[in-house]
C-alpha cells in the first residue's frame, strides 16, 4: 500500500526538522513525513558540532549564507529562551596571531556591519577585560558580543517534540532507495512506498547521493570536511 503525504522531508537533522517546523506552522493540516536513515536524531553534523551560534560576520554581504546566518542566529536564540533550552551568551573575540593577519580584522568588521551584526574593534586593554589570557599581536581584536553557545542535542530534541505534538510523522532507520519522480513516489529499504506532493532533500553531506536517486544534479559531487574539537574541562 502506498501512503500519501503532502510533504516528505529526507533527513532529520537541524535543517530537515526546521523545514518541517516552519511548514507545519504555516499549514497545521499539512501531512508531513520526515525520513531519517539513522536510529535517532543528531548522529551526524547536526549533533556533532561546537554549538556556536554565529552572529553573521564571516560571509560576504548579499549572499544567502550572510542573510540566513544573521537572521537565523536571532531566531535560534529566541527559540532557546522561549523553550528554556541552554544558551550561553558569552560573546566571541577574534584576534590575529600574526601581523599579516591584521587586515582580516578589518575585513570581518566590515562584513559584520554590512550583514547587520553587532561587532566592535577593541584594544588589547579591552580584550584583557573580556579574557585576561588572550593576547593580540597587533594590539587590536574583533569583538562579537552576540555570539552564543547552545546545546545542539537539546534543540534537536525540542524541535522533534514540537513536531510530533503537531502531528508530523518521523520514521527512523529508513532511507529512500528508489524514486519515481514522474509519479511522485519513493520506496525505502523497508519496502515502504510513499507518495508525495512535494519532497525536500535535507540530507546534507549525503544530498548529492540522494539527488542522483531522483536523476537530479548528477554532475555534482559533495566534498565533505571533518572538523575535530577539543573538550575543555
Predicted regions, residues:
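Beta1/beta-strand and adjacent pyrophosphate-binding region of the FAD-binding site
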Residues: 2-15, 33
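Conserved Rossmann-like nucleotide-cofactor binding loop
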Residues: 15, 40, 206
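Gly/Ala-rich phosphate-binding loop of Rossmann-like dinucleotide-binding domains
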Residues: 20, 24, 162
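Glycine-rich FAD pyrophosphate-binding loop
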Residues: 24-48
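Short loop/edge segments at beta-strand edges and connector loops
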Residues: 36, 89, 123-124, 172-174
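Dinucleotide-binding Rossmann-like beta1-alpha1 core, especially the glycine-rich loop
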Residues: 51-126
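Helical element adjacent to the flavin cofactor pocket in flavoenzyme catalytic cores
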Residues: 141-198, 202-209
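Central helical "cap/lid" subdomain
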Residues: 192-233
Amino acid at each position: 500500500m502506498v501512503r500519501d503525504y503532502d510533504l516528505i522531508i529526507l533527513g532529520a537533522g537541524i535543517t530537515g526538522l526546521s523545514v518541517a517546523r516552519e511548514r507545519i506552522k504555516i499549514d497545521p493540516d499539512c501531512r508531513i513525513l520526515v525520513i531519517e536513515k539513522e536510529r535517532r536524531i543528531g548522529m551526524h553534523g547536526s549533533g556533532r558540532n561546537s554549538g556556536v551560534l554565529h552572529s553573521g560576520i564571516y560571509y560576504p554581504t548579499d549572499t544567502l549564507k550572510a542573510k540566513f546566518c544573521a537572521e537565523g542566529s536571532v531566531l535560534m536564540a529566541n527559540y532557546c529562551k522561549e523553550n528554556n533550552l541552554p544558551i550561553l551568551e558569552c560573546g566571541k573575540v577574534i584576534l590575529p596571531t600574526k601581523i599579516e593577519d591584521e587586515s582580516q580584522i578589518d575585513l570581518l568588521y566590515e562584513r559584520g556591519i554590512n550583514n547587520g551584526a553587532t561587532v566592535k574593534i577593541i584594544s588589547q586593554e579591552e580584550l584583557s577585560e573580556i579574557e585576561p589570557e588572550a593576547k593580540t599581536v597587533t594590539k587590536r581584536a574583533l569583538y562579537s558580543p552576540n555570539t552564543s553557545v547552545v546545546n545542539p542535542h537539546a534543540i534537536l530534541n525540542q524541535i522533534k517534540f514540537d513536531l510530533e505534538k503537531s502531528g508530523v510523522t518521523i520514521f527512523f532507520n529508513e532511507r529512500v532507495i528508489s524514486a519515481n519522480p514522474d509519479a511522485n513516489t519513493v520506496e525505502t529499504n523497508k519496502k515502504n512506498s510513499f507518495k508525495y506532493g512535494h519532497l525536500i532533500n535535507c540530507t546534507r553531506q549525503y544530498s548529492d547521493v540522494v539527488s542522483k536517486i531522483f536523476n537530479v544534479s548528477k554532475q555534482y559531487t559533495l566534498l565533505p570536511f571533518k572538523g575535530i574539537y577539543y573538550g575543555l574541562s
